A protein has these predicted regions:
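Membrane-interface capping segments at transmembrane-helix boundaries
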Residues: 209-210
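Short, threonine-centered small-residue motifs that mark membrane-proximal processing/anchoring sites
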Residues: 4-30, 178-206
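A domain-level signal for the mature, folded cores of soluble proteins
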Residues: 28-152, 157-188
Length: 210
């Protein structure tokens, strides 16, 4: 057997094992894929229906049944979140109007603390604070069209710190949620890198067919 063939065989086996483990761990996770959607920096902001995958810059009437609404208030730290009844963003304490930046792998579920209807963010170096010019992950809960509570995460790429004011840019990179009602989800899972593994397997298969 040629060395290249043996290498491709090992790649396929490793990819299959890894994909099987990923599928088992995330069988109920619904992932958006990479979106890179630029949010409007105004008081309407962006309305996101995580079940249908629809997101657009306001008004709210454009996205029926929306679940997450990042927007900019006329004053504040740069971005706010508004949640419909039953929703909320993961916060440092229950009912506190803040949305914290989560480390990858943090579990989001019934035992998490959630904000009230409106939540703000703050930038800084302390745990839970958001970072300029970086990806930040926020956790959320929402009530599905079936009336059940689900948990998810959303990744935002925040722009560089503005010279003045609170006009920092914000981009929805991706999001995911648990399709099983009440089930917890790990922040940032599945990661884009895990999905890229499919491309590795596909490449190896293509080379073998030649």
């Amino acid at each position: 057997m040629r060395l290249s063939n043996r290498f491709e065989k090992h790649v396929l086996v490793a990819a299959a094992v890894a994909m099987g483990a990923t599928a088992a761990a995330n069988a109920a996770v619904v992932y958006s894929g990479i979106l890179n959607f630029s949010c409007a920096i105004d008081t309407d902001g962006t309305y996101i229906n995580v079940e249908t995958g629809q997101l657009t810059n306001g008004p709210a009437s454009l996205v029926p049944g929306w679940d997450v609404n990042p927007y900019r208030s006329s004053s504040g730290s740069g971005m706010n979140f508004f949640s419909p009844t039953g929703g909320g963003m993961v916060s440092a304490a229950a009912g506190v109007g803040s949305a914290i930046n989560l480390s990858a792998g943090t579990l989001i579920g019934a035992s998490s603390n959630f904000s009230s209807a409106t939540a703000t963010i703050s930038f800084g170096s302390a745990a839970g604070q958001w970072q300029y010019a970086s990806n930040n992950i926020v956790g959320f809960r929402f009530v599905s069209s079936a009336g059940t509570t689900h948990y998810g995460w959303m990744r935002f790429l925040m722009g560089s710190q503005p010279a003045s004011g609170n006009l920092v840019t914000r981009t929805v990179v991706d999001f995911a949620y648990e399709s099983v009602a009440g089930a917890s989800i790990a922040a940032g899972v599945p990661a884009p890198g895990a999905i890229a593994l499919l491309g590795v397997a596909g490449l190896a298969g293509t080379r073998r067919r030649r």
